[in-house]
């Protein structure tokens, strides 16, 4: 919403007509082709799957606010942290998510961005120590393995937020899995 408002302000500021701005907004489709990794919503066997590239506490707060407005019987999240962030920022992401999701899958990907093996995962786990909602935490090595584990657990009516790291590759993997085992997005 904030990005759309900024775009409207910029368009108005350079003198575009309101009708042109309105048509531009009306034509925007938030899918993996037009805005990869930006709240891409898909259906997988009757469950809602959302792929997003958020990797900081502000993004987690915005994502939690958005998914709180969506139906979801059981809520799960798949997350890895970007190793080039401050320890507190990595930890705070799962502090926020731990209050909004029943199941959390932590994954470590190949690119740790200067961190030692397991260091980012440990910080994410620390953030879940006082989780008010999370009941199940799993740790998995590999982004696609984590995505597959999350998809396998989904039941109709569930909601799963997947915080992707390798955006294009993860979206292609999700698309393939959806075409193989569920309804298309």
Regions found by a protein language model. Name each.
Residues 1-5:
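Short, conserved micro-motifs enriched in small and acidic residues
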Residues 6-185:
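ATP-dependent carboxylate-amine ligase
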């Amino acid at each position: 919403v904030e990005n759309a408002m900024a775009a409207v302000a910029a368009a108005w500021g350079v003198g575009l007509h309101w009708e042109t701005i309105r048509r531009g907004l009306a034509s925007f489709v938030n899918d993996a082709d037009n805005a990869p990794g930006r709240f891409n919503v898909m259906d997988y066997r009757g469950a809602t799957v959302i792929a997003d590239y958020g990797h900081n506490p502000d993004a987690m707060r915005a994502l939690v606010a958005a998914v709180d407005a969506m139906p979801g019987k059981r809520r799960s999240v798949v997350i890895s942290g970007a190793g080039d962030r401050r320890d507190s920022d990595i930890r705070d992401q799962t502090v926020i998510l731990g209050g909004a999701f029943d199941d959390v899958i932590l994954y470590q990907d190949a690119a740790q961005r200067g961190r030692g093996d397991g260091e980012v995962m440990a910080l994410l786990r620390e953030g879940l120590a006082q989780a008010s909602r999370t009941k199940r935490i799993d740790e998995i090595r590999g982004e696609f393995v984590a995505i597959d584990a999350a998809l396998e657990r989904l039941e109709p009516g569930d909601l799963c937020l997947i915080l992707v790291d390798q955006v294009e590759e993860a979206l292609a993997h999700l698309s393939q899995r959806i075409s193989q085992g569920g309804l298309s997005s």
